[in-house]
Swiss-Prot record:
Small GTPase that cycles between an active GTP-bound and an inactive GDP-bound state and mainly functions in vesicle-mediated endoplasmic reticulum (ER) to Golgi transport. The active GTP-bound form inserts into the endoplasmic reticulum membrane where it recruits the remainder of the coat protein complex II/COPII. The coat protein complex II assembling and polymerizing on endoplasmic reticulum membrane is responsible for both the sorting of cargos and the deformation and budding of membranes into vesicles destined to the Golgi. GO terms for cellular component: COPII vesicle coat; cytosol; endoplasmic reticulum exit site; endoplasmic reticulum membrane; Golgi cisterna membrane; phagocytic vesicle. Mg(2+) binds at residues 29, 70. The gene is sarA. This is Small COPII coat GTPase SAR1A. SUPFAM superfamilies: P-loop containing nucleoside triphosphate hydrolases. One of its GO terms (biological process) is regulation of COPII vesicle coating. It comes from Dictyostelium discoideum. Homodimer; upon association with membrane. Part of the coat protein complex II/COPII, composed of SEC23/24 and SEC13/31 heterodimers, that it helps recruit and assemble on endoplasmic reticulum (ER) membranes at ER exit sites.
Amino acid sequence: MFLFDWFWNVLSFLGLYNKNAKILFLGLDNAGKTTLLGVLKDGRLSSYLPTFHPTSEELAMGNIRFKAFDLGGHESARRLWKDYYPSVDAIVYLIDSSAQDRFVESKKELDSLLSSDELANVPFLILGNKVDIGNTSEEKFRASLGLTQTTGKGKTTLNGVRPIEVFMCSVVKRYGYAEGFRWLANYL
């Protein structure tokens, strides 16, 4: 729990306190979206059934308040994603980095999101999840998704460039995603 509290205190320190944000958790089915949301909500790991209906959680941690939407990742759920684009502040796109056979499908969906006019100025945090069970390097992961040029992991402001960055993580082992959310906090 100490790491969890520390993470949110850092976000507050970075200036994301007393702000409200709407964040979409997107990605193919079985990428870990619901598991990540559960860990962020109450710090516990649980087993989840596939998400067949959109769910949302109001999370208030430290001085940060955001509404997170988990929209599901199976093919029929993906058709509903666009209904949630208006007024979104950030996208967290999770990919199962151990399922290399699904990288093409993940890239197709990510490319569709990145080409949406409604999301043109929305920061994207790409999480390569499940690094604890796969052997995909960040370089191979980036290359598979065509993301060799991204914003950079520091606080970088580039005029006219949408913030987008890749972080490798394991939600189950609880590492990597905190750095990603710290990066995302710079752009909310």
